[in-house]
Amino acid sequence: MAKPTVVLLPVWGAGHFMPMIEAGKRLLRGSGGALSVTVLLMPAPTPDAAVDIAAQVKREEASGADDISFRHLPAVDMPTGHTGVEEWISRILRSHAPNVRAAIAGLDCPVAALVTDIFCTPALEVSRELGVPGYVYFPCSASMLALLLRSPGLDEEVAVEFEEMDGAIRIPGLPPVPPSALPSTMLDRKKSTYDWFVATGRGYMNATGFIVNTAAELEQSVIDAIADGRCTRGVPAPTVYPIGPVLYFPPPPEEQPHECVRWLDAQPPASVLFLCFGSKGLLPPPKVREIAAALGRSGGHRFLWVLRGPPKDSRHGQRVPTDAMLDELLPEGFLERTKGRGLVWPTRAPQKEILAHAAVGGFVTHCGWNSILESLWFGVPVLPWPLDAEQHFNAFTLVAHLGVAVPLGMDRRRDNFVEAAELERAVRSLMDDASEEGRKARAKAAETRVVCRKAVEEGGSSSTAFRRLTDDIVRRGAVQIR
């Protein structure tokens, strides 16, 4: 008889696809050969995303893993009439629900579980219809999960726009949250994206469990609050399995090290500020000018700045940066004035290799959770510059909850604008040896490096949670779908 399979339904995107695949591979290893993994592939919405996914699938298939297979779902029409990318992705997934149902029904082996992405609540309805346990793979923080679960209650309890509230918002397990730190999806309750957010939090209660890319030691108070029902008004929430950090480390290149890494090799330890705003992080010219001004007068601190150009197509889901034309984007003479202590890189850069380098002493990040986990894994303190989605909430937790960041003042109403003087102050605070604020962030980042690595070791908290997840899936049994 064929092995029971765990079906994965990932979405495209750097912080979504490979972490879920890595979690699936760990599930295989943890099952001791009792399970297989089937990955359902939705067509990516952009050519660049399709190329990335195809390359990653090819790598996995070439690795020779017998118990992991990939199945392509047919294309669906792209939705229209949405107010945000999160809602857009979720509507794509709702269109795929019949395809997911048909693909699972067509498997020739029993199905032990369906694991969906954060956006895939429609797939939880499919799992319930088929009688299969449905898990949400949550590639964000447990704090963000707590906010989502709390959102239906907040929607009923708060009568005004959250930004008009007096005082802070209470999320069990977290310090008081200022309304300015809420995700962009919560800031306009008249938009359908807000309705999507609240409906997602409500729909999550139909899950069997949450597989969260975090370590218990990083967010224990939040995980406890979810488990106690404090985020869901006393109703027991699905089980949380904190199994992170789950990070994808590609095979090392056979050729010589990347040019950015070679440049770092020539810099003193912990002397370089690394600036990178994610795979879709785009900075308009006014922000570029402020960063250049701050770096030009930030006390001579070294820097490595990944600066991308504007996208060719800015429709939802297609904001893919291009290679930057540095002479057009940067102030005249900037490269010459900073030559020797700074490198501006105009295309993709190997972020993990850079964060792992001993020369890097600080990280200006857009606060995507995957980038945060990488900085925690390598013990690099942070200057948070959130741009969109849940990133402002992540920035808040980095400063107020985890303590690994120096706060950066910004004007969210001006598209998250940061004045050069404020960025210069924050850079000095993070990087100067004499800064008490920076010293605390550096010390806390060094602690989290140890915590993250111990968590995934044999017997660590994340390793134990993964074993518990595997045992629970096997114990529940598998269903032969007809």
Curated annotation (Swiss-Prot):
Chief location category: endoplasmic reticulum
Assigned EC number: 2.4.1.-
Keyword set, alphabetical order: Endoplasmic reticulum, Nucleus, Transferase
Pathway per the UniProt entry: Pigment biosynthesis; anthocyanin biosynthesis
Record-linked SUPFAM superfamilies: UDP-Glycosyltransferase/glycogen phosphorylase (SSF53756)
Subcellular location: Endoplasmic reticulum; Nucleus
Annotated protein name in UniProt: Malvidin galactosylase UGT88C3
